[in-house]
A protein has these predicted regions:
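S-adenosylmethionine
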Residues: 1-389
C-alpha cells in the first residue's frame, strides 16, 4: 500500500468509523506496513500529524467534497498553510474555536489549542510494586530524562526518552505506568483516609482505582462499570499493578441506577465525557467532536452526579474536558438542586487554575490546562454536604 492510500485509510477510519488514532493506525497498518519498530514509530507520528491537520486540510483543499485520497495527497505535498481563518490555522472546528475563544479570549484559545499539538507524557511510579527511589533509578538507567512533580512525588514528567515509553523496562513490568498528571490530581482530591470505602462510579480501565489503593492500602474500593469487557480487562490490569484482591470489588452496573445498603465515605465520579481535554493524546478528537456529543455527555454527567450524591456526602467529580458543559454547567445545576459546598483542598489552591470566570463558584473548583500545567485539560471538583464538613 502506498502512502496516499495508507493515509487515506487512516482518515477514513477516524472520520467514518469514529475510532481513535491508535485504532485507525492499527487497522490501516495490520502489522504489515513497516519492517522495523523505528519505521513504525515514524509512520505513526506522521499519521498523528495528518489527523491533527484534518480540519486544516478541509479548509485549504479547493474541492467541495474532497476524498480522503485528495486530503492525503494535499498533506503529503505540504498544502496546510493557505487559510487565514483562525480555526483553520489551529485545525479545529469553527464552533469549538469560537466556544474556547468566548471563554479564554483569542490569545488564550490559541495558546491552549497549540499546546495540544505536542503530547506530554507523565509516568506514575507504582509503589505497590517497588519504592519510588528504585523506580527512579531504573528510569535513569534506561536513559530517560524526566522531572519529578513538586507536589506529587510519585508523578514524573518525561522530558526525553530513548525509546517508546511502553518499551521502558519499568513500564513493561508495571513499576511505572503512563498516567496523566490530571488523573493523579483527581484522585488526590478524594483525600482517601485509612479504612475509607470509596465508590468509583465509572472505574474501567482502573488506573484511578489502583491509585486510590496505592495511596491508602487499607481503603476499599467498590468499582462499577457498565461494560463487562472493560471490567475483565480491568481485573487483569489490577493484578499486574499489584493491587490486593481484597481491596477492590468489581461490579457490573449502569451507575445511574445503583443502590447501596449504606452510604460510603467517598465517591469518585470520573465521568464519561467528550475527552476534549485529551486532544494531545488523540488528535482524532479534533476531527470528530460535535456539539451533540458534548450535550449528550453533559446530560449523562448530571444524572451520574445526582446519583453519586445519594451514595455519599463527599463526591469528587471530574471530566477530561475543556468545555464548561462538562464541568461548570453541571455543577451550577447541582448547586441549585442540592445543599453542597465546593472545596479545593488547601494543598492545591495555588496549583489549580480556577474555573471559567463567568461562574460564581469558579474559585472553588479546579481546572488544569496543557499550556499551564503540562497536563490534559481537566475539570476537577469536590462536593461536600454540610454534615461532612
Amino acid at each position: 500500500m502506498n502512502k496516499v492510500d495508507f493515509f487515506a485509510k487512516v482518515l477514513y477510519e477516524v472520520i467514518e468509523r469514529r475510532v481513535s488514532l491508535d485504532v485507525a493506525f492499527k487497522r490501516a497498518c495490520k502489522r504489515r506496513c513497516v519492517r522495523t519498530l523505528e519505521e513504525r514509530e515514524k509512520l505513526y507520528q506522521e499519521c498523528r500529524k495528518l489527523v491533527s491537520d484534518y480540519v486544516k486540510l478541509k479548509c485549504v483543499v479547493s474541492k467541495r467534497s474532497p476524498s480522503y485520497r485528495d486530503l492525503a495527497r494535499a498533506w503529503i505535498s505540504g498544502k496546510t498553510s493557505n487559510s487565514s481563518e483562525p480555526h483553520c490555522q489551529l485545525s479545529v472546528s469553527k464552533w469549538l474555536y469560537e466556544r474556547i475563544t468566548s471563554l479564554l479570549g483569542s490569545s488564550g484559545a490559541e495558546t491552549m489549542l497549540k499546546a495540544f499539538e505536542e503530547r506530554t507524557w507523565w509516568l506514575r511510579l507504582n509503589t505497590l510494586k517497588a519504592p519510588e527511589e528504585r523506580v527512579l533509578k531504573e528510569l535513569e538507567a534506561e536513559g530517560l530524562e524526566f522531572e519529578v512533580h513538586s507536589e506529587i512525588p510519585y508523578m514524573v514528567r518525561v522530558l526525553k526518552s530513548p525509546k517508546p515509553i511502553r518499551l521502558l523496562n519499568p513500564v513493561r513490568e508495571f513499576r511505572a505506568l503512563p498516567q496523566d498528571l490530571a488523573s493523579a490530581v483527581s484522585v488526590e482530591f478524594i483525600d482517601v483516609r485509612p479504612g475509607d470505602v470509596v465508590v468509583d462510579m465509572c472505574a474501567a480501565p482502573g488506573l484511578k482505582t489502583s491509585l486510590i489503593v496505592m495511596l491508602e492500602e487499607s481503603a476499599r474500593v467498590i468499582a462499577f462499570d457498565i461494560s463487562s469487557k472493560r471490567l475483565r480487562v480491568m481485573r487483569q490490569l489490577l493484578k499486574k499493578l499489584g493491587v490486593p484482591e481484597n481491596s477492590v470489588q468489581l461490579a457490573l452496573a449502569d451507575s445511574r441506577f445503583i443502590n447501596l445498603v449504606r452510604p460510603v465515605d467517598k465517591v469518585l465520579l470520573d465521568a464519561p465525557c467528550s475527552n476534549s481535554g485529551s486532544i494531545d493524546k488523540d488528535p482524532s478528537i479534533k476531527a470528530t467532536l460535535t456539539q451533540g456529543k458534548v450535550e449528550f455527555h453533559s446530560n449523562r454527567q448530571l444524572e451520574l452526579l445526582l446519583k453519586s450524591l445519594e451514595l455519599s456526602d463527599c463526591v469528587v467529580y471530574t471530566t477530561c474536558s475543556i468545555l464548561p458543559d462538562e464541568g461548570e454547567d453541571v455543577i451550577e445545576k447541582i448547586v441549585k438542586k442540592t445543599s453542597v459546598k465546593l472545596v479545593v483542598p488547601p494543598r492545591f489552591r495555588s496549583f489549580c487554575s480556577p474555573g471559567y470566570p463567568s461562574y460564581g463558584f469558579s474559585n472553588n473548583v479546579c481546572r488544569l490546562y496543557p499550556h499551564i500545567h503540562k497536563s490534559e485539560g481537566f475539570f476537577i471538583s469536590r462536593l461536600e454536604r454540610p454534615q461532612a464538613l
